[in-house]
C-alpha cells in the first residue's frame, strides 16, 4: 500500500508535542510492515539549521493562494526507509517556531494547497492519505471540492487523526475565496460553518473517509459535551467512521536495558540498577539520599489542563507524608511559583526544577517509584507509558488515553500497572496517593509485581501500527 502522511510537524525534524512523535514513529513502523510510505512536512528554519546538509532539492513550482502566486520548493530526504518531502517557502516557514503567528491560517492554507499539488509532481499518488489535526484537516475537503477534476486523485482514501480537539482552526469565511480559491457554497449551506466561522476541523471530520483519535476513550469522550469542544454533535453524527487507536512509544529509545541517558541499566527481573538511579537522582536534585522513601516524579507542562490546580491544592497535605517529589516542567507562572514556594518550605521533600532537561526527564522516568499525571483531559499521553517502561507506576486521573493505558491496581487480585481515580478533586487525589503509599511501604511483594506488569506492557509502535493498518485496510483493499 502507498501511504502519504501530511502534517505540520514530525520528529526528528520538527516537534512541539505528541503529533511530532507520531509522525516520526508510525511511518517507520509501516515501512517495517512492508508498505511504501512518504511524509510531507513544512521546511522550517530549524530543519534547515539541523538537517539542511542531509536534504536535497527536488523541484519548485508556484502555488495559487487565492490571488497570490507563491513560490513552493520541494526538498527530500530518506530516513529509516521513509521518504520525507518538505514544502519550502521561507516567508511562511522561517519564523523561528512552528505555530503561534497571526497568519497561521494563511501559512497552513498554503501548506495544504502545496501538499496536494506536489503529489503529482513528485510522482507519489497514495492509496491512502493520512492528515493530522486542523493544520491539514482541509485537505479531504479540497480533494473532493477543488481538485476533483484531477483524475489521478480520484481513488485516494483519506484519514484524519485528531490529536487534540481543542485546536480547530477557526477563521473568517473570507479565507475560502481569498486563500483556498473556492466558492462559498459549502459555507453558506452550513457544511463548513461553525459559530459563524470557517472551521477546518469540522471540514476534516465531514470530508475524511475515516476519523481517528489517539485513544479509544478519547474517541468516546469527544462525542460528549464535556470533551467535545462544541463539535460533539458533529462527531456523533459521524460516529460510524470515528475510532480510537492508542499511540505507541519508541521501544528502542525508551529501554531501561540500553538507555544511553541512564547511569545504570536494569530490567524487570533485576531492578538493582533502578535503585542506583534513584540514589543518583536524589543526589542530583538535592534531596536526601534514602532508599526507603517513595520518590514521586512529575514531568509535565504546568497547566490547568494537566490538573495542576488540583495538585497545588493537595500539595501541603501530600508533603506531610514521608515522601519525596521531583518536578520538572514549565508553564503557568502561578503554578511555577507555587511549586517553587513549596520547595523552599519543604527542601528535603520537594525539588522543583522549573525548566526542561531531556536527561533529567529520562532520569525521572527511570528512577522514581511513582509518576503523577492527573490530567483534566488527555487525548493519549506518552509520559505514563514511558514511566511504566521503566517500572515507575503512574498515578493518573482516569480519562482519555490514561484510562486506556494504565490498568488500575486491583487490591483483591493484586494486579495492575498503576493507580487511578475517576473524580478529579483533591480528596480523590489524596485518597489514591495514600493507597499507593500504603502499598509501597507495607506490601513490597505486590508493589514489585505491579512494576513487573508495567514493564511488560506492550506500547511499541509496531503494535500500534497493526491497528492503523486495520483502519487503512477498511478503506483500501
UniProtKB/Swiss-Prot annotation:
Annotated GO MF terms: alpha-1,4-glucan glucosyltransferase (ADP-glucose donor) activity; alpha-1,4-glucan glucosyltransferase (UDP-glucose donor) activity
Binding site for ADP-alpha-D-glucose: 15
One Pfam family recorded for the sequence: Glyco_transf_5
Catalytic activity: [(1->4)-alpha-D-glucosyl](n) + ADP-alpha-D-glucose = [(1->4)-alpha-D-glucosyl](n+1) + ADP + H(+)
Known pathway: Glycan biosynthesis; glycogen biosynthesis
Matches recorded under InterPro entries: Glyco_trans_1, GS/SS, Starch_synth_cat_dom
EC number: 2.4.1.21
Family, similarity comment: Belongs to the glycosyltransferase 1 family. Bacterial/plant glycogen synthase subfamily.
Name the UniProt record assigns to this protein: Glycogen synthase
Organism: Streptococcus pneumoniae (strain Hungary19A-6)
Annotated gene: glgA
